[in-house]
Amino acid sequence: MSTEREAKVYVNGSLVGTHENPEELAEQIREARRRGEVSEMVNVSVRDRTGEVIVNADAGRARRPLLVVENGEPVVTQEEVEAVKNGDIDFEDLVEAGKVEFIDAEEEEDILVGVEEEELTTDHTHLEIDPQLIFGIGAGMIPYPEHNASPRITMGAGMMKQSLGLPAANYRIRPDTRQHLLHYPQKAMVNTQTTEQIGYDDRPAGQNFVVAVMSYEGFNIEDALVMNKGSVERALSRSHFFRTYEGEERRYPGGQEDRFEIPGDDVRGARGEDAYTHLDDDGLVNPETKVDDSSVLLGKTSPPRFLEEPEDMGGLSPQKRRETSVTMRSGEDGVVDTVTLMEGEDGSKLAKVSVRDERIPELGDKFASRHGQKGVVGHLAPQEDMPFTQEGVVPDLVLNPHALPSRMTVGHVLEMLGGKAGSLDGRSVDGTPFTGEGEDEIRGTLEDRGFKSSGKEVMYSGVSGEKIEAEIFVGTIFYHKLYHMVSNKLHARSKGPVQVLTRQPTEGRAREGGLRVGEMERDTVIGHGAAMVLKERLLDSSDREEIHVCGNCGMTAVENYEQRRVYCPNCEEETDVHSIEMSYAFKLLLDEMKALGIAPRLELEEAV
C-alpha cells in the first residue's frame, strides 16, 4: 500500500492494492485480455469520481458482445465476417482473437459504442454487431420500433408477453393451473430478424387484422375498438381458457384418510343429491360434462376434526365425516376437458380436473398491437353496418385516428402499410429495426398493385351505402388478444361472506367480496347531501351492530338471556340502559382497548 493519492484497486469487490495511474492500469488489463493473456471473462472499469479500478470476473453478470474499434475502424475485417457466415471460423474464434469483446454493465460506463459503422469517430471504442441488438427479445420483435416513442416500445414489449397463442403443444396433458389457447394463430405479415431467430413464426401469438383508421359513431373514443361481428362469428380471436382443479386423498395421523366418493346423507355438510348427479361412483366427474358456478368436480369426504359431544346415554356419538368436495370457482363455467388420476409423493391418490371455457371476443376484452396501442372492445358492429372499400373489403377492426398523433406510434402506421403490401404480394415484409424494408419500397409495392401509395382508400358507409367523404387509411396489422378478459374481471355483489374479525364484507372477486366505498366516494355522497345513502353504504350494508350501553357510566352493558335482563355490570343498573347502533369495527376497537386496561366510556345524548 502506498500514498493516499493512489487509486484503490478492487477485484470482485475485495481491495487488493493501489495504483498511481488507474486509467493506464485499466487499459493494460484490456490489452492483455485482447491478447489472450487475461481471461475473456474479465471486465474492468474506472470510477469517474473516485478513480477506483473495479475488476470483475465473478459469476452472474449480464454481458453482451461488441466489436472492438481502433482508430475509428472496426478491428474485424470483411473477410472474417464472410468466414463466420460461411462457417469457416466460429464466433468464439473472433472473441479469442480479441476482435469481439463481451462487456458487462460496469465496463459499459467506460466505453463509447457506435450503433452504425458510418458514425464511427476516433473517440469510439466499440461498435454494435447489428443496430437491432440495442433491443432485447421483446422490443426486437416489434417492427419499425425506431419510428415509435420509447414508452410505447416498452408497453408493446410488455403486452406481447400477455398475448394468447399456443403455449405448449402438449397443452391437453399439462396440469397448469391457468392456460389460454388461441384458435388459428397466424404468422405476422411484417416480421423482424429477432422473430425468425427465436422461432416465433412457428408458434405465433396473434392474428393479422384488416384495420380501418376512422371514427365509428363514437363507439371507439378513448381507445375503444370497434370489431366486426361477422369476423368474430368466423372465429377471429376466439380462444379457450383452461383451469385445473386439484384434489388429494390425504392421510392423517391415526390411520384416517380422505376418500373420493359421493358424500352420503350422513356426511356433515352434504349438499343434497342434486349437487352430485354428474359424479361417478368413484366421486370423479366425467370428461365433456357441462359444469357451472359452484358445480362439484370431485366428491370428497374427510374424517372429523374433533370428537363429538357426549350423548345423553353417556358414550360418544359415532363420528361423522366432513364434506370437503372440490367445486368450481364462483362465476366460472365450462366443460370438463380431462380428468387425470395420479399418485402423490407419499403414495396418496391425486386427481386433477381440467375445465375448458370457450372465450369469444366480447365488450371489454383487451387487444393490442405490437406498438403499445392497446384498447378494449367498445362495440361489436354487424358486418352489414361496417364500412367497406371499393373492392368490398370489410375491416375486422376500426381504430380511432386520435390514438395515433399524440402517441407518435408511426411504426404502427408503417406496419399497416407493410402488412397491406405483404398481403397483396403474398410475402412477408421485413420490419427489422434500422435495417428493415424502407417506406418508399412499401409504397412502391402498393402503387404497383393498383393502390394508392398513402394506403388510403375510398370507403362506403355500411349503414347508408353512401360514399364516405374522406379517404380512409386501411391496412393489415398484427394484433394480440391479451389475457385481460372481461369475463375474468366482471364482479358484483349484493350479499355474501363477511370477515370473521371485523364482520365487514370480504375483499376481492375470488372471495365474492364487496366493492369498497372509500374516502373519495364518501365525499361525493356528502357533496350531494345524501345522508341516508351515506349511512346505508357505510353502516347498514357493511358491519352494523346494536349493543347495549349504560347511560349512567357509558360502559357496555350485558344481556343475560337466561334471566332475560339487560344490566350494567359496572353500576348494577337496569333502568338506564340504551340500545346503540354502531359499526362492529368500532365495537371491536372498544373491546381491544378494554383488553389493554383502558376503559372507554360513551357519552349518550338524545337524537334530535
Swiss-Prot record:
Cofactor note: Binds 1 Zn(2+) per subunit.
GO molecular function, one term: DNA binding
Localization (cell): Cytoplasm
Function per UniProt: DNA-dependent RNA polymerase (RNAP) catalyzes the transcription of DNA into RNA using the four ribonucleoside triphosphates as substrates. The Rpo2 subunit (Rpo2N and Rpo2C in this organism) is implicated in DNA promoter recognition and in nucleotide binding.
UniProt KW Oxidoreductase keyword: no
Quaternary context: Part of the RNA polymerase complex.
E.C. no: 2.7.7.6
Reaction(s) catalysed by this chain's protein: RNA(n) + a ribonucleoside 5'-triphosphate = RNA(n+1) + diphosphate
CC cofactor: Zn(2+)
Residues that bind Zn(2+): C550, C553, C568, C571
Domain of life of the organism encoding this protein: Archaea
Family the UniProt entry places it in: Belongs to the RNA polymerase beta chain family.
A Pfam family: RNA_pol_Rpb2_4
Protein name (record): DNA-directed RNA polymerase subunit Rpo2C
